[in-house]
Design a protein with these regions (language model features):
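Short aromatic/hydrophobic "clamp" motif used to bind/position activated sugar donors
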Residues: 81
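Acidic donor-binding segment of Leloir-type glycosyltransferases
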Residues: 18-59
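A recurrent flexible, glycine/aromatic-enriched loop bordering the glycosyltransferase active site
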Residues: 119, 131-150, 162, 168-169
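Glycine-rich, basic loop-to-helix element that forms the pyrophosphate-binding segment
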Residues: 60-76
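Non-catalytic, C-terminal membrane-associated alpha-helical segments of glycosyltransferases
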Residues: 208-267
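Acidic donor-binding loop at a coil-to-helix junction in glycosyltransferase catalytic cores
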Residues: 164-179
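Conserved donor NDP-sugar-binding/catalytic core segment of glycosyltransferases
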Residues: 93-126
Length: 267
């Protein structure tokens, strides 16, 4: 039977949230905690995690969520890898759904699912029917907690210019990762079933307050559609934001265009 490995990527004190949510041990599930520590005094892991034989904790000093995910993937040993945040909650039923989908799609290198908020509502407007990533409805996108990776597949690394903790682009790493994988020939299949509950907010909620999120939107559009296509989409996006002030829209457009140029000329 395939082994599931939940890859928790956490920073400093966020590790404390994991212990409260772990289900009882299960022979086909293991947990890898990639724990970034930013320096200063040495931090101790919660005793509840240290007592679990199914939990491995690896400490490193890098900065940035994408770097942490790459670190976790490089050290993973399971067959099916779940990308997890500290606030994610898993139950046996979710693992069973994942295993069933993986068995139904042995050709898929990446499996996509749904996430639910703690009160039961879906975290976003997901496609209603199963589909491949290439055939997904327009406007559909997926977050890290929706993604399960087959370790044996040819997978890209996360682009470390994107994501929380990155210098300029504060999100978008999942969209770039999935697009790179798809272009590289990896088959990606979506199953409309919930496999995780979370209390976390999406980075899209910070669009108007965080310039790094706005820059990332421009950069992601540039990767997907090229500089010209991205610029036209940014102009349209800024024009239709009727609830935002003129100043907010100008600032958003500036940051998105900045992101386009950054992606085009950086590496």
């Amino acid at each position: 039977m395939p082994k599931i490995e939940v890859l928790y990527c956490v920073l400093d004190g966020d590790i404390r949230h994991i212990a409260a949510h772990l289900p009882q041990p299960r022979p086909d599930v293991a947990y890898l905690v990639a724990w970034q520590q930013r320096g200063g005094e040495e931090q101790n892991a919660p005793g509840e995690l240290l007592q679990r034989d199914d939990v491995k904790i690896l400490v490193h000093k890098s900065i940035g969520l994408s770097k942490n995910r790459n670190f976790a993937l490089a050290n993973a040993t399971g067959d099916l890898l779940i990308l997890a945040d500290a606030d994610n909650i898993y139950i046996y039923e979710y693992f069973d759904r994942l295993l069933a989908a993986a068995a139904a799609h042995p050709e898929a290198g990446i499996l996509l699912f749904q996430a639910a908020a703690s009160e039961g509502s879906l975290m976003k407007n997901y496609p209603a029917a199963p589909c491949t990533y290439a055939e997904r409805p327009r406007g559909s996108y997926f977050s890290s907690w929706d993604i399960v990776l087959r370790r044996s597949a040819a997978l890209p690394r996360f682009d470390e210019r994107f994501g929380l903790g990155a210098e300029h682009l504060g999100c978008g790493e999942e969209e770039i990762f999935l697009e790179q994988a798809s272009r590289g020939g990896c088959r990606i299949v979506y199953t409309p079933q919930v496999i995780v509950t979370t209390r976390a907010a999406t980075t899209g909620d910070r669009f108007w307050s965080d310039p790094k999120v706005r820059r990332a939107k421009g950069a992601v559009l540039c990767y997907m559609h090229g500089p010209l296509g991205a610029t036209l989409r940014c102009l349209k996006f800024a024009a239709v934001q009727g609830k935002a002030s003129v100043g907010q829209r100008i600032r958003a457009l500036y940051d998105m265009i900045w992101g386009i140029f950054y992606l085009k000329f950086s590496r």
